[in-house]
Amino acid sequence: MNSKKHLGHTARKRFGQNFLHDTSVIQGIVAAIYPQPNQFLVEIGPGLGALTEPVGELVDHLTVVELDRDLAERLRHHPFLHQKLTVIETDAMQFDFGALYTKENLAEKGQKLRVFGNLPYNISTPLMFHLFKYHDVIQDMHFMLQKEVVKRLCAAPNSKAYGRLTIMAQYFCQVMPVLEVPPSAFKPAPKVDSAVVRLIPHKELPHPVKDLYWLNRVCSQAFNQRRKTLRNALSTLFSPENLTALGIDLNARAENLAIADYARLANWLADNPPADINKDEILDSEE
């Protein structure tokens, strides 16, 4: 028996496909999303419809973004939801959610996008970074993720889970864990535990920065060398005198600073950019 085959479809490794089938977990996720008939919901990676069907039954219309050609075609011909579904066959990492918001005239309707999905674990972090760009047109997001990723999203300073992903997520959103999900809830079963997280974009950013590049830069540099003191880890960006003037303990490490501290450092760099920094380079990170 092919353990990767579910409802006639074989999971494709390159798309990171693991299909949810546990009814109680599905009910818990739908309850957390709490979809209402007139809301504009967007599902990323609907797969075989484990969440699409129960959510679709509760709303007037549902937009789904699916990269897998075969699955997209199945959804277009869904036996009882096809008239409610708009299937966008594309890579969510490349999709312009802002253009969708504009096309659907949601501003005139006083609405924003509600985004949810069982995200492919191999792209979940970069996909969330992509979605954060559209924080001002998104009402909330509910995602199934690797449990360790949810821990990082929800982490507090002075913990091992606290990192660049924590800071960037909490910069844009209020983050709350919803429920934990065992591997047995999927087919094929992943090798890791999963969890559902709720992200609600801030109506007003609590710690706005002048240029997101510098927030990304200082977080990447600090957490890539998280065992070093900030005096050493950030030495190419700040002098010890600069850090002290900004209220940073020279002996602190990356996980000791709050988001407000990183925002303060980023804003100083925006006003005092090092001459030898190329802003077009790709930032590496431990996340």
From Swiss-Prot:
One of its GO terms (molecular function) is RNA binding. Pfam families: RrnaAD. It catalyses: adenosine(1518)/adenosine(1519) in 16S rRNA + 4 S-adenosyl-L-methionine = N(6)-dimethyladenosine(1518)/N(6)-dimethyladenosine(1519) in 16S rRNA + 4 S-adenosyl-L-homocysteine + 4 H(+). It is found in: Cytoplasm. Its EC number is 2.1.1.182. The keyword Methyltransferase applies. It is an enzyme of class 2 (transferase). It comes from the Bacteria. One of its GO terms (cellular component) is cytosol. S-adenosyl-L-methionine binds at residues 18, 20, 45, 66, 91, 118. InterPro entries: KsgA/Erm, rRNA_Ade_diMease-like_C, rRNA_Ade_Mease_Trfase_CS, rRNA_Ade_methylase_Trfase_N, rRNA_adenine_dimethylase, SAM-dependent_MTases_sf. Transmembrane segments: none annotated. Keywords: Cytoplasm, Methyltransferase, RNA-binding, rRNA processing, S-adenosyl-L-methionine, Transferase. Specifically dimethylates two adjacent adenosines (A1518 and A1519) in the loop of a conserved hairpin near the 3'-end of 16S rRNA in the 30S particle. May play a critical role in biogenesis of 30S subunits. Belongs to the class I-like SAM-binding methyltransferase superfamily. rRNA adenine N(6)-methyltransferase family. RsmA subfamily. This is Ribosomal RNA small subunit methyltransferase A. It comes from Haemophilus influenzae (strain PittEE). The lineage of its organism: Bacteria, Pseudomonadati, Pseudomonadota, Gammaproteobacteria, Pasteurellales.
